[in-house]
C-alpha cells in the first residue's frame, strides 16, 4: 500500500467522494419528517434498524456518509481502504434495492421505475471494488515490468 493514492484512482475517488459527502451534508440537516422517512425506508429492508430512533439513525447515516465521502477525497487514505468503505456502503444500498418491495420488476433483477434511483448505485459498488483491487493490480503490473 502506498502513502498517497495513485493518480489513476483520483477521478473515481473525487466523483464518488463528492457525491457521498454532499449527500451526507444534506442529511445532517434532516428534520424529524425526513429522519422518519430515511429510517422507515432502511428499517423496511433491514428490520434490526427498527429499534434505533429515527433521529439517531439519520444522524448516524449522515455522519457515516460525511466520513466516507471525506475518506474518498483525501489522497493520503489508501485506495484499498477507501474502496472497502465504498463497496460496503454500496452493498448496503443495493441491499435496500433487493429487499424493498416495488424496486424491481416482478421476477427480475431489472429495476422498476421506482427502483432506478437505487439500482443505479451499482456503479458505486463497481468503483469500490476497483479501488479495493487497484493496489494489487498495480503491484502485479510493476512486477511483470521488472521481470521482463
Model feature map: region roles:
Residues 1-148:
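Short amphipathic, positively biased membrane-proximal segments
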Amino acid at each position: 500500500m502506498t502513502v498517497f493514492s495513485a493518480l489513476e484512482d483520483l477521478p473515481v475517488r473525487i466523483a464518488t467522494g463528492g457525491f457521498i459527502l454532499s449527500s451526507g451534508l444534506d442529511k445532517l440537516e434532516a428534520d424529524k419528517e425526513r429522519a422518519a422517512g430515511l429510517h422507515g425506508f432502511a428499517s423496511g429492508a433491514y428490520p434490526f434498524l427498527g429499534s434505533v430512533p429515527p433521529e439517531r439513525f439519520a444522524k448516524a447515516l449522515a455522519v457515516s456518509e460525511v466520513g466516507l465521502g471525506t475518506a474518498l477525497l483525501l489522497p493520503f487514505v489508501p485506495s484499498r481502504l477507501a474502496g472497502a468503505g465504498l463497496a460496503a456502503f454500496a452493498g448496503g444500498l443495493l441491499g435496500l434495492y433487493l429487499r424493498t418491495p416495488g424496486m424491481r420488476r416482478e421476477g427480475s433483477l431489472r429495476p422498476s421505475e421506482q427502483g432506478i434511483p437505487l439500482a443505479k448505485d451499482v456503479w458505486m459498488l463497481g468503483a469500490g471494488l476497483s479501488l479495493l483491487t487497484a493496489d494489487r493490480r498495480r503491484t502485479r503490473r510493476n512486477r511483470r515490468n521488472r521481470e521482463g
